[in-house]
Amino acid sequence: MNVLAYARRHGRESVAWYGGLGLLTLRVARNLQLPPSYLVIVAREIDIIGVRSLVVALTAALFTGMVLALQSAVNMAIFGAENYVGPVVALSILRELGPVLTAILVGGKVASGITAELGSMKVTEQIDALRAIGVNYIKKLIVPRVLAALVVFPLVTIMADGVGLLGGMLIVVFDRGVDPYLYWNTISYWVVMKDFLTGIGKSVVFGGLITLIGCYNGLETTGGTEGLGRSTTDTVVQVAMAVIVSDFFLTKLLLLLFW
């Protein structure tokens, strides 16, 4: 009986959460046009989301490329195909690992920070004060963060892709003895523009989704500091799950459309 009660309660909470997130998305879409004075806020959010997250994203990309190249080279050498490690690394990073790892690592950091900031404003009634004086808090607090994420996540993903490919080259050249020109030539032969654009398109969707989750959980925070801690923890988990689940559906859609 307790299990059924928990399932019903959890089901209601899940429906309410998805519905609230959808409504927030619609409200953001209706308020995308910002006054010039708000562009300063967008620039500040770009710095917070992108510049301050580069070290994490690029370090992860470097070692991901190295590990992927190492594992691929060892196994492909069995079949005499070690010269084709480059395309395997490139396709894996450009289509999947680059956008997904960037979204999970940077997104978890960014979204939890957004939840903590907006949640503290909610529990201290600052958002209620903005409403009381007639300020559109969606336009002032949410839209700049979403726009910044839509710009930053693709740019960080592009840099992560490049660093990941360089990491793969380091292993292939210095550990496996493959000519670096062969590494890049095989990549340029097998990898086409749509492989690159697939990952960039995913990163745009991930950026918007991650930011909306962080904002929504912050706005729905209740229960003081304890509730703020729960909201921040929930955001990290929900961001990771949202990226992984949406990646499957995006991959399926892109394969149907372009392959």
Regions found by a protein language model. Name each.
Residues 1-40, 217-222:
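Short, membrane-interfacial amphipathic segments enriched in basic
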Residues 228, 234-252:
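Final/C-terminal transmembrane alpha-helix of multipass membrane proteins
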Residues 48, 56, 60, 81-114, ...:
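Loop-to-helix entry region at the N-terminal start of transmembrane alpha-helices
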Residues 118-143, 225-228:
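Short cytoplasmic-facing helical segments at TM-TM junctions of multi-pass membrane proteins
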Residues 34-59, 237-240:
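Membrane-interface helix starts
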Residues 137-157, 231, 235:
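Start (N-cap) of specific transmembrane helices in multi-pass transporter permeases
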Residues 71-94, 162-204, 208, 212-232, ...:
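Membrane-interfacial helix-loop-helix connectors in multipass membrane proteins
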Residues 56-71, 249:
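Hydrophobic alpha-helical transmembrane segments of multi-pass membrane transport/permease proteins
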